[in-house]
Amino acid sequence: MSRIGNSPVAVPSNVTVTINGQNVEVKGPKGTLAIDVPEPITIAQEGDEIVVSRPDDHRKSRSLHGLSRSLINNMVVGVTEGYTIKMEIFGVGYRVLAKGSDLEFSLGYSHPILIKAPEGITFAVDGQTKFSISGIDKQQVGQLAANIRRLRKDDPYKGKGIRYEGEQIRRKVGKTGK
């Protein structure tokens, strides 16, 4: 029995949910998100709650049950509050600059790296080493943060690189010379 899938999704008063077959569209103060729910899962709106149910207890139905409920909940939270991921850069000469709505990174390569903001994503730069990624789609914000982090992953020996704010990197001891 899916503990996540069985709990209904609460819908605030300023959010409108439209269910059209397997398509769910959520409109809120920050924007609109839509998703196609996989086939065996059924969605129904009961008052100010969305109930996600499955027809049987097959393994695939059970896994899609919790997934569908979580995706709908993430959409409701996204259009009301939004999602923000804060990141920081460590390293001598490593910095980030805001170029309009885009970010330009200087990460020790021979060229600067320009990251364009996808539609629905905004960047905020705080100083030269801290920035944040904001948007209403949790998956898009998280994927963009992971792609930016991959530009210069943290070095366990020197501690240089891009990391999430508050992330602790396990440091390694270097070779001891004679």
UniProtKB/Swiss-Prot annotation:
InterPro entries: Ribosomal_uL6-like, Ribosomal_uL6-like_a/b-dom_sf, Ribosomal_uL6_a/b-dom, Ribosomal_uL6_bac-type. It comes from the Bacteria. SUPFAM superfamilies: Ribosomal protein L6 (SSF56053). The keyword Protein transport does not apply. GO terms for molecular function: rRNA binding; structural constituent of ribosome. One of its GO terms (biological process) is cytoplasmic translation. Keywords: Ribonucleoprotein, Ribosomal protein, RNA-binding, rRNA-binding. Belongs to the universal ribosomal protein uL6 family. Part of the 50S ribosomal subunit. This is Large ribosomal subunit protein uL6. It comes from Corynebacterium kroppenstedtii (strain DSM 44385 / JCM 11950 / CIP 105744 / CCUG 35717). The gene is rplF.
